[in-house]
């Protein structure tokens, strides 16, 4: 369903965002 798609998109966005940060130190 649409909710499942949103969930997958959100997880993908978070994963891409984390990779974009390049492992910046989390404070």
UniProtKB/Swiss-Prot annotation:
Gene Ontology cellular component list: extracellular region
Q: Where does the protein principally reside?
A: secreted
Q: Where expressed (tissues)?
A: Expressed by the skin glands.
Q: Protease: is it a keyword of this entry?
A: no
Which compartment or compartments is the protein found in? Secreted
- Keywords recorded for this protein, A-Z: Amphibian defense peptide, Antimicrobial, Secreted
Q: Superkingdom, according to UniProt?
A: Eukaryota
The GO biological-process annotations, alphabetized, read as: defense response
- Record has Transcription regulation as a keyword: no
Q: What is the purpose of this protein?
A: Antimicrobial peptide.
The UniProt entry's sequence similarity note says: Belongs to the gastrin/cholecystokinin family.
Q: What is this protein called?
A: Caerulein precursor fragment R5
Q: Which organism is it from?
A: Xenopus ruwenzoriensis (Uganda clawed frog)
